[in-house]
Amino acid sequence: MDVKGHSRIALATIALAFAGAAAAFAAAPGNPKPVKEVGGLWFDKDGAPTYNITKDGTVDWGTFVGYLRYNSICLDCHGPDGSGSSYAPDLTQALQQLSYSQFIADVAGGIKSVNTAQDLVMPSFATNKNVMCFIGEIYSYLRARSTGALGRGRPAKSAPDPKGFDEASYKCLGIPM
């Protein structure tokens, strides 16, 4: 995929994040079967990012990038492999109910759930390009974990990075080439 394509995906993803009210009522994720690949990221029939793991265990590039980004940004609160912590939920369980649009709304808008039993707060990541430029990849990784298609730990094998991925990533992040 060329730089424009990746940038369009990132902008569309950010735009979806602000559709918050409608996103709250979206259906849970459906069949994760991959049907289309764009720039290393696979999508299901509904257009949500998904994983493509081959019989020999090779993980698609987007899911592998999602693993790397998750571990650099989300792990501190949500624990290794999305398994949760004493103060942040298990995302492998949450993604069994969260659609892609709900996931984006939660990540971009943050979450605040305060009651007599708990005080949970997740900040907004809407302006964090290290998150929003790779939100589809992070979702794909967590989706693979939530369905049991991908085990714990670093994937042993990954597909090669697709042509133009680095350039598109740098552009989204605002890094000159």
PLM-predicted stretches and their roles:
Residues 2-11:
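Bacterial N-terminal signal peptides that target proteins for export
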Residues 22-26:
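Boundary at the C-terminal end of the N-terminal hydrophobic targeting segment
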Residues 27-62, 75, 79-94:
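His/Cys-centered metal/cofactor-coordination and adjacent catalytic loops
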Residues 70-80, 103, 107, 122, ...:
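The canonical Cys-X-X-Cys-His
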